[in-house]
Amino acid sequence: MDPKLLELLVCPVTKGPLTYDRERQELISRSARLAYPVRDGIPVLLENEARPLSDEELEQ
């Protein structure tokens, strides 16, 4: 994930920052408690495509 692109992207739900999880290929929104998939290098920032994050995942 290009760091400059990551600086421009925000969570579509909260408009908060996103962090990239390279291992899972996801963009994480801690404020929305959602993980958005990155497919073939393209972020899919759709709420209905995101998965909810557990408390354990948020603590990492």
Swiss-Prot record:
Pfam families registered for this protein in UniProt: Trm112p
Gene3D superfamilies the record matches: 2.20.25.10
InterPro entries membership: Trm112-like
Gene Ontology cellular-component annotations: cytosol
Sequence similarity: Belongs to the UPF0434 family.
UniProt protein name: UPF0434 protein Dtpsy_1553
